[in-house]
Regions:
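Beta-propeller blade termini and top-face loops
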Residues: 1-290
C-alpha cells in the first residue's frame, strides 16, 4: 500500500509431507514471476516447482512437480574436482541449483504454460499443470544442462513460443535462440545476424506485429523485422552494455531496456519500427504513421 506503506511477504512456503517434514523450495537469485494474461489475480512464481496463486499471492499452490533434473550440486564437479566443506567460496553467488529461471503463459489460453530451468529442462503443459512434457530433446544443438534464459509466447500466433539459452557458465557463448510454432514439439534456430561469442539474455515479440522481435545479449540490442529471419544491431546512443530485460509499453508503444549496470533506457514510440518490413526497405519512399 503506497499510501500507508504497509507491505507483506507473499513468498510461498512448502507444507511438510510424510517423509519430507523439512521440505524447502529452491529459488533462483532472479526467480521469474508473471501475472496471468487472462486473470490479473493469478500470479506465477518459479522455484523448483511452478507456484501459482489465484488471489494475488495470499495463498499458493504447486502447479507442477519438481520440473528440474534434481541434481545435487555437491555432485557436480568444478574443473574436474568435486567441492568439499573446505572449498573456498563454495557455491559463491549461487543461491541454489535446480530451479526455474524462465516461465511464460500463453497469451491465447491459460491452460498453456512453459518453464525453463537452470539445469537445462524446457517443460510445457497444455492443461494448467496437470501434466508436463520436457521438450528439451527437440531443441537441436544446445548442450545438456544449458541455462534457459528466457521464454516468450506470441501475441498473434497460437502455439508460437521463443526460447533462449545462456551457456556462459560453461564457457559457451553461443547465441542460442529458437522458435517453435507447435507448442514446443519442434524447434528451429533463428540466429542469422546474431554475433557469435555473446550469449542471449532475453527475447520479446511486439504485441501488434509478430514479425518485429527484439533481443538482448551481452553487448546490446538486436532487432528483427522478419520474425527472426535475420537480425541487426540497434545502437544509436545506447552504449555497449548487457541487456538483461526488455519490455514494450503497450499504451505508449515505447521500448524499455533493463541493462546490467547502465540503468534503464527508453526508446520513445517505436511505431516506425512496427511498420518497417522488407517491402518498406525495398521501396523508394515510405510515409510512416505517427
Amino acid at each position: 500500500d503506497v499510501a500507508s506503506r504497509e507491505a507483506q511477504s507473499i513468498r510461498p512456503v512448502p507444507r511438510p509431507t510424510a517423509g519430507e517434514e523439512n521440505r524447502n523450495y529452491r529459488f533462483n537469485w532472479d526467480s521469474p514471476f508473471a501475472i496471468s494474461h487472462h486473470d490479473p489475480a493469478t500470479i506465477y512464481l518459479g522455484g523448483n516447482h511452478l507456484m501459482r496463486s489465484r488471489d494475488r499471492g495470499t495463498t499458493w499452490e504447486e502447479a507442477s512437480p519438481d520440473l528440474t533434473k534434481m541434481i545435487d550440486r555437491d555432485t557436480v564437479s568444478i574443473m574436474g574436482r568435486l567441492v568439499t566443506d573446505e572449498t573456498l567460496s563454495r557455491h559463491d553467488g549461487i543461491s541454489s541449483y535446480g530451479n526455474i529461471t524462465a516461465l511464460a503463459e500463453s497469451k491465447h489460453s491459460p491452460d498453456v504454460l512453459y518453464v525453463g530451468t537452470d539445469d537445462g529442462n524446457l517443460q510445457v503443459t497444455r492443461d494448467q499443470g496437470v501434466t508436463w512434457t520436457n521438450v528439451i530433446d527437440q531443441v537441436s544443438g544446445v548442450p545438456p544442462r544449458t541455462y534457459v534464459s528466457r521464454i516468450e509466447t506470441s501475441y498473434e500466433v497460437d502455439g508460437r513460443v521463443y526460447a533462449t539459452f545462456d551457456g556462459h557458465r560453461n564457457d559457451d557463448y553461443s547465441p542460442y535462440t529458437f522458435v517453435s510454432n507447435d507448442f514446443g514439439s519442434t524447434w528451429r534456430t533463428i540466429t542469422n545476424g546474431l554475433p557469435e561469442g555473446w550469449s542471449v539474455n532475453v527475447i520479446r515479440e511486439h504485441p501488434e506485429n509478430s514479425s518485429l522481435l527484439f533481443l538482448g545479449n551481452e553487448i546490446g540490442l538486436y532487432v528483427s523485422i522478419n520474425a527472426g529471419g535475420s537480425w541487426g544491431r540497434m545502437q544509436n546512443n545506447l552504449p555497449p552494455v548487457a541487456v538483461d530485460d526488455i519490455a514494450i509499453h503497450t499504451r505508449e508503444n515505447d521500448l524499455v531496456l533493463g541493462t546490467h549496470g547502465r540503468s534503464i533506457w527508453i526508446l520513445d514510440d517505436i511505431t516506425p519500427l512496427q511498420e518497417l518490413s522488407d517491402q518498406v526497405l525495398a521501396s523508394a519512399a515510405h510515409l510512416f504513421g505517427s
